[in-house]
């Protein structure tokens, strides 16, 4: 196993634990139709690099964050924006997870409406480069 955590193992717990997203399904792989629940946010890594000066301490992955809602386009946009604010706050507050924490955030493509892959739902998606660091040591 590599020294760096998967970005999803840092981002998903942050989103799941925030009360602003209570009732929202946070996934890193969209479940089969029989198990899919809306509203839903899917986090998927689509690229990024490690810090050349500290490759075992800091990476800069790019994630695709997709918000899905069956309530309407406006509600879907608001869901995306709320999740994005949760990530900005996690960077600002240095929110720790067992896997690590987020040290920076940069929107490479802001919130964009796409056709949803799932019947009777809307999708808002953006690309976000996150600074991911290993957990802080207390020793």
UniProtKB/Swiss-Prot annotation:
Domain of life: Viruses
Entry protein name: Gene 22 protein
High-level lineage: Viruses, Duplodnaviria, Heunggongvirae, Uroviricota, Caudoviricetes
């Amino acid at each position: 196993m590599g020294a760096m955590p998967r970005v999803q193992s840092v981002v998903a717990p942050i989103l799941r634990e925030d009360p602003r997203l209570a009732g929202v399904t946070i996934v890193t792989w969209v479940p089969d139709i029989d198990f899919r629940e809306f509203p839903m946010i899917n986090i998927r890594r689509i690229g990024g690099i490690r810090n050349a000066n500290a490759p075992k301490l800091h990476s800069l992955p790019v994630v695709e964050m997709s918000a899905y809602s069956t309530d309407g386009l406006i509600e879907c946009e608001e869901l995306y924006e709320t999740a994005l604010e949760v990530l900005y706050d996690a960077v600002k507050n240095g929110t720790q997870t067992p896997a690590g924490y987020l040290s920076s955030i940069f929107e490479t493509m802001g919130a964009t409406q796409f056709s949803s892959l799932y019947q009777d739902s809307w999708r808002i998606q953006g690309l976000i480069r996150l600074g991911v660091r290993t957990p802080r040591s207390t020793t």
